[in-house]
């Protein structure tokens, strides 16, 4: 009898362990059910939980700008660099919207958009050409009195690592003497190492994601990779898509 009971108990424990493991994988690979779940995966504050259809985007990015300022002690330091790290599928323009928010406050801002291509071959606003050794410095496109924009030219890069290049790093550092804010709009963290390379150069890093465009496992990987690379994530902007 004791042996049978032991076998039954062992089988039951095995089933419980399997269910627990299955539940763990289920939770790990599912999409986060709430902003709180995103917060738990990344272990950083939720800057805003955006109900997309009703959202006033201008207010959202004002809130983000204020959050990032508070994180540096509330003072307007000259030349603060901020890296936008989108994870999963959804937001490609969060960096632009943040840069516009800084510019609206009359802060001289440079956006380096690593997602957007430059306007044609003759455009002088490509950071790629400069990093690849072009003697002439990039000429940012002027969006308004307070906002300048640089893009990248992926085709011209030919898989050369532009963001990890020393010329890119020194350019960002140099621009901190000219601009009050430098915003780097990085590509999707899940698909490119550029966001981490840019993150190492910046004073502040924040994450943006849509709940419908990311799973928990990707969020855990982002948290761990940032920790390994010594990148502090200030907070996350969550869209309820």
Predicted feature locations:
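Conserved Switch II/interswitch segment of TRAFAC-class P-loop GTPases
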Residues: 185, 189-191, 202-220
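Switch II (G3) loop of P-loop NTPases
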Residues: 149-194, 199
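Short boundary/hinge segments that flank catalytic cores
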Residues: 5-110, 114-148, 156-162, 166, ...
């Amino acid at each position: 009898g004791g042996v049978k009971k032991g076998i039954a108990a062992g089988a039951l424990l095995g089933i419980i362990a399997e269910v627990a493991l299955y539940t763990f994988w289920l939770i790990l690979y599912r999409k986060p059910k709430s902003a709180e779940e995103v917060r738990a995966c990344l272990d950083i504050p939720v800057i805003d939980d955006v109900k997309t259809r009703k959202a006033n985007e201008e207010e959202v990015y004002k809130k983000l700008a204020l959050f990032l300022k508070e994180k540096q002690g509330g003072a307007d330091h000259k030349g603060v660099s901020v890296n936008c790290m989108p994870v999963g599928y959804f937001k490609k323009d969060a960096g632009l919207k943040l840069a516009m928010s800084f510019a609206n406050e009359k802060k001289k801002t440079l956006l380096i958009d690593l997602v957007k291509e430059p306007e044609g071959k003759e455009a002088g606003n490509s950071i790629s050409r400069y990093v690849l050794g072009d003697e002439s410095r990039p000429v940012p496109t002027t969006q308004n009195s307070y906002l300048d924009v640089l893009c990248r030219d992926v085709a011209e890069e030919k898989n050369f690592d532009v963001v990890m290049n020393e010329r890119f790093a020194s350019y960002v550092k140099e621009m901190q003497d000219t601009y009050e804010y430098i915003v780097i709009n990085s590509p999707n963290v899940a698909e490119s190492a550029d966001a981490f390379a840019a993150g190492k150069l910046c004073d502040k890093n924040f994450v943006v994601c849509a709940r419908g465009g990311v799973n928990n496992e990707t969020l855990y990987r982002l948290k761990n990779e940032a920790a390994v690379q010594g990148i502090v994530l200030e907070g996350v902007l969550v869209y309820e898509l």
